From Swiss-Prot:
InterPro entries: CysI (IPR011786), NiRdtase/SiRdtase_haem-b_fer (IPR005117), Nit/Sulf_reduc_fer-like_dom_sf (IPR036136), NO2/SO3_Rdtase_4Fe4S_dom (IPR006067), NO2/SO3_Rdtase_4Fe4S_prot (IPR045169), NO2/SO3_Rdtase_4Fe4S_sf (IPR045854), NO2/SO3_Rdtase_FeS/sirohaem_BS (IPR006066)
Pathway linked to the protein: Sulfur metabolism; hydrogen sulfide biosynthesis; hydrogen sulfide from sulfite (NADPH route): step 1/1
Organism encoding this protein: Baumannia cicadellinicola subsp. Homalodisca coagulata
Protein's name in the database: Sulfite reductase [NADPH] hemoprotein beta-component
Transcription keyword on record: no
Length: 566
């Protein structure tokens, strides 16, 4: 087994990172270029490290080409928001910016437990970053080869424990921020210094690929821990955080028709005391920094490093670097995932209202005024908001005397709708068209009508009060987490998807491809057949994903490196 990085020519991303002068590149010069609406050359990649992606409106490409115009280039910004916690005052600020300075006028909640602005034109970029800074926010390292936004269970019911794990999410996020002053210099007009910069943890060429961390509090796997490179499973005693089980090597991205790529669930390393959290996290990240493949970006994620060097080798390397020995994994189990909708009361007697936001898109339309509703709530709310990893939002910390007012506003603006089915609440999609340049098929715009058709099928089979974890993603990169769904659709081309079946309801089993390149009609026919059988043949409390495996409709994925593509 080769435990060293294979000798090969480094990918071009490695060159541009080293040549970027600690992520500066010539971004500042491109900002002054009024000839084009976008960035050029290496800067297209470098702005990702500052939390932005260069995109264009794909709906308008043909029209603008006919008009001999460049594409409608704009930027998507993803905010750094560890644990998804945002104050009402911050919300008021981002609402105002989205309304006045974005092409689409929306706030998009994401599976990384934060929000995104879509459709920001280049002249508005500096003002956007300055606004975030004035609100105590930033977008540092929410994209690029960095530690991304840190996820944390959105469970304010266990108030003390939740606050403790959220504090660790913030500590981890801060600890692994890049030390370069490039962000402040470029976007905040910070003073340029002549000092020699260093990146003691990330290194001058940063990480081989993006790196994702989650903290989860059992029994609710609301963050889909197996989608992340590094996971901390909270272990408590008498309601107090005492330590974490550590899992590494999860990840969902793959490439169509490339059998060397695959999704993977995370592997257990062991248990650590809570005081060792940062040391272990740093040891894991530096191990991946040094052992990750920098020649082939398709194999650069931690999951491939683990497969190449082996779990035990990786574990021992982490122990040596941290000076800490892992203990045996403490018992834990997951019983559900997703979000707990409606009102719940925490042990501190505060109330928390979880709102379903379909596909995370907060916008006013002809049917509902979700954005106005959130704005009105933010104007009076005295607690905070918690964005969830399932693209929903919690109105947290509501005193009993304010419950009625909050609920009235939520109902008035369509943020609460008693007609939303369990199936719709269990369905999720990535953004895809028109802004994502990687999308091969529709996802967010496709899902609502598709779910309606699935709801009708389930009602016909007497399953109207049941749910199936359903995910749609426009490409195989995994943003919609279809590779942890019971039914996963992955875009192949316009109007066609690969269909995956057999994930479980708690997010611990990867589904397997059932049919390739299907139309919506063909997918619905399969869902009709399999849910009909599920309704007739299921065992008590047996989920759809478990049923299709037990019934032999699909074989379970046991070791994705070996059998995912079989």
């Amino acid at each position: 087994m080769n435990k060293k990085i294979p000798k090969a020519i480094l990918s071009d991303n490695e060159r541009l990172k080293v040549a970027s002068n600690f992520l500066r590149g010539t971004i500042a010069q491109d900002l002054q270029d009024n000839i084009t609406g976008g960035f050029k050359g290496d800067n297209i990649q470098l702005i990702r490290f500052h939390g932005m992606y260069q995109q264009d409106d794909r709906d308008l490409r043909v029209e603008r080409t006919c008009q001999k115009l460049e594409p409608l280039i704009n930027m998507m910004l993803r905010c750094r928001l560890p644990g998804g916690i945002i104050t009402p005052q911050q919300w008021l600020g981002i609402d105002s910016f989205a309304t006045k300075h974005t092409l689409y006028g929306s706030i998009r909640l994401t599976t990384r437990q934060t929000f995104q602005f879509h459709g920001v034109l280049k002249p508005n970029l500096k003002n956007m970053h300055k606004l975030l800074h004035s609100l105590g926010l930033d977008s540092i390292a929410t994209a690029g080869d960095m530690n991304r936004n840190v996820l944390c269970t959105s469970n304010p019911v266990e108030s003390v424990l939740h606050q403790q794990v959220c504090n660790y999410a913030k500590m981890i996020s801060e600890h692994f921020l890049p030390k370069t002053r490039a962000y402040a210099e470029i976007w905040l007009d910070g003073e340029k210094t002549e000092t020699t910069e260093q990146e003691p943890i990330l290194g001058a060429n940063y990480l081989p690929r993006k790196f994702k961390i989650s903290i989860v509090v059992p029994p609710l796997n609301d963050v889909d821990l197996h989608a992340n490179d590094l996971n901390f499973i909270a272990i408590s005693n008498l309601g107090q955080l005492v330590g974490f089980n550590v899992l590494v090597g999860g990840g969902l991205a793959m490439t169509h028709n490339d059998k060397s790529t695959y999704p993977r669930t995370a592997s257990e390393l062991g248990y650590i005391s809570v005081v060792d959290t940062i040391k272990i996290a740093e040891a894991v990240i530096t191990t991946q920094r040094d052992l990750g493949d920098r020649s082939n970006r398709k194999h650069a994620k931690t999951k491939y490093t683990i497969e190449r060097v082996g779990v035990e080798f990786f574990k021992k390397e982490v122990e040596v670097r941290a000076g800490i020995k892992f203990k045996h994994i403490r018992p834990y189990s997951f019983t559900e995932r997703g979000d707990r909708f409606g009102w719940v009361q925490g042990i501190d007697n505060q109330w928390h209202l979880t709102l379903f936001i379909e596909n995370g898109r907060i916008i006013d339309d002809s049917h509902r005024k979700l954005k106005t509703g959130m704005l009105e709530i933010a104007r009076i709310h005295q607690g905070d908001f918690r964005i969830t990893a399932n693209q929903n939002i919690i109105i947290a910390g509501v005193e009993k005397k304010h419950k009625a007012t909050i609920e009235l506003l939520a109902r008035q603006y369509g943020l609460i709708n008693n007609n939303i089915t369990l199936q719709r609440k269990a369905s999720m999609a990535c953004v895809a068209f028109p802004t994502c340049p990687l999308a091969m098929a529709e996802a967010e715009r496709f899902l609502p009508q598709f779910v309606t058709k699935v709801e009708n099928i389930m009602s016909r089979h007497g399953l109207g009060q049941e749910k199936i974890i359903l995910r749609v993603t426009g490409c195989p990169n995994g943003c919609g987490r279809a590779m942890l769904a019971e039914i996963g659709l992955v875009g192949k081309t316009i109007g066609r998807y690969n269909l995956y079946l057999g994930g479980d309801s708690i997010g611990t089993r990867i589904p397997r491809i059932y049919r390739e390149n299907l139309t919506e009609e063909e997918i619905l026919s399969i869902i009709n057949d399999t849910t009909g059988r599920w309704a007739r043949e299921r065992q008590p409390d047996e989920s759809y994903g478990d049923y299709v495996v037990r019934a032999g409709i699909i074989r379970p994925v046991i070791n994705s490196a070996l059998d995912f593509h079989n």
